Amino acid sequence: MKKLKILMAASECVPFAKEGGLADVVGVLPKHLARMGHDVRVVMPRYKRVDRERYGLKQLPGVLVVPMGVIGNQYCGVWEGRIPGSDVPVYFLEHEGYYDRDGLYEVNNEGFLDNDNRFVFLSKAALELPKMIGFEPDLLHAHDWHTAAIPVLVNTTYAADPYVGGKATVLSVHNMQHQGNFYEGLMDVLGIGWEHFTFLGLENNGEANLLKGGLYHATVLNTVSEGYAREMQTPEYGWGLDGVVRERAADLYGILNGVDYEDWNPEVDPYIAARYSAADLSGKKLCKRDLQRTFGLPERDDVPLFGMVSRLVKQKGVDILAEAIHRILALDVQFVMLGAGEPWTHFYFGDIKNAYPDKFNIFVGYNNPLSHQIEAGADFFLMPSAFEPCGLNQMYSLRYGTLPIVRATGGLDDSVENFDEKTLVGTGFKFWSRDAGALFDTVGWAVHTWYHRKDAMERLIANAMAKRFTWEDAAARYEDLYGRALRKRLGEKEFARRYGKG
């Protein structure tokens, strides 16, 4: 297939601005697509935290004019940079009224009241940008509700646009829970006509739902694991849009995220106490001692050490962990936790720390070096998520020989193979029911294995460390997805004429 011109629009991208896993995908996937020969450009807001000098941004001449319906034209400057370690251009939209704020989406857990206008602006600006930079994309790739208006606009207001009209669109859904549901008056800002405010359009319980519009209008859809692609079609995980997803099931694909093994590799990790490999695990024992020391726990080789790095919110399963933690700590184990989230969790697990000073400690906040140290020093890594579209820490854990204990949902189910005690096949421990009893039973199973099945532990660690989830593989699947989108948009004959049969 002929190499493509791809415009990718997103609300965040590492290293410039990050709140979740979306940023990792947008910061890494374009680099690998570019290495395959594709011309990929990224567009995102220039938030207050995006330092122009640090990233060597250069302002483009002129001003981008963005029509915002009843609001009127809005204007922004455009700055150009590069994703570090690549030649992939990133275009930053500078609009002080929308983006010169401390948070990306909220401050003090309160979402900005104009998030609807902020991200409709991002979507429209992304469609105006190609004229400014002289770049006619073959395909537009939107991510989550923040840019889900792009497929809608391409099919309506911009249908005759010489740069983006009639183009194939891909919408990646990273989390169905967040949908961009706003007051119906947003239709007048979108400027696409009220005939699209219907049950088979953007209307959702009397509001305008940007993700719903994108799900209906995108040429093809994908999410970040095959498991989550199935779950999105159920009432439990579809968050009210499962019917829409089922309607588009033939155009929905699951692509598991990759891991940046340049950053997550115990053989070269600069943050851990000692390097190690599958062939020589002696360094992992030193990492365990160092982790115990860092968290103020007794330095014991004869006890299994559990680790957890997570946002402390219900989605991540901290509610069932809170219910099970006393039973877990009644076992001869140690447990370290890194994360922040709902205020009650800080107090609750702080009390657990005081009640079990030799067994449990928590660092409230996020610390990247410490997250590496937990992955390297722990024996087991806990992820009891209510739902997990992809998840990355379980894949990091496998590389570090730290056996994941996960609830079998989404990407966790896809990437962790359950331990079989007879065949010694597997890479971790899984449970299915979302309750404290199932979590405790699985932790108990892992503890029993650690104490009484050293042969099984050795095999599990070897199995885990042999697994690979590369971005090269993920990028190849995205390339195939782009081909599917173009074939659907153009038809097989026109696709072959323009891009070849590959």
Curated annotation (Swiss-Prot):
SUPFAM superfamilies: UDP-Glycosyltransferase/glycogen phosphorylase. Disulfide bonds: none annotated. Its EC number is 2.4.1.21. It is an enzyme of class 2 (transferase). Pathway: Glycan biosynthesis; glycogen biosynthesis. Pfam families: Glyco_transf_5, Glycos_transf_1. CDD domains: GT5_Glycogen_synthase_DULL1-like. It comes from the Bacteria. ADP-alpha-D-glucose binds at residue 18. One of its GO terms (molecular function) is alpha-1,4-glucan glucosyltransferase (UDP-glucose donor) activity. GO terms for biological process: glycogen biosynthetic process. One of its GO terms (cellular component) is cytosol. InterPro entries: Glyco_trans_1, GS/SS, Starch_synth_cat_dom. It catalyses: [(1->4)-alpha-D-glucosyl](n) + ADP-alpha-D-glucose = [(1->4)-alpha-D-glucosyl](n+1) + ADP + H(+). Keywords: Glycogen biosynthesis, Glycosyltransferase, Transferase. Synthesizes alpha-1,4-glucan chains using ADP-glucose. Belongs to the glycosyltransferase 1 family. Bacterial/plant glycogen synthase subfamily. PANTHER family: ALPHA AMYLASE DOMAIN-CONTAINING PROTEIN (PTHR45825:SF11), GRANULE-BOUND STARCH SYNTHASE 1, CHLOROPLASTIC/AMYLOPLASTIC (PTHR45825). This is Glycogen synthase 1. It comes from Geobacter metallireducens (strain ATCC 53774 / DSM 7210 / GS-15). The gene is glgA1.
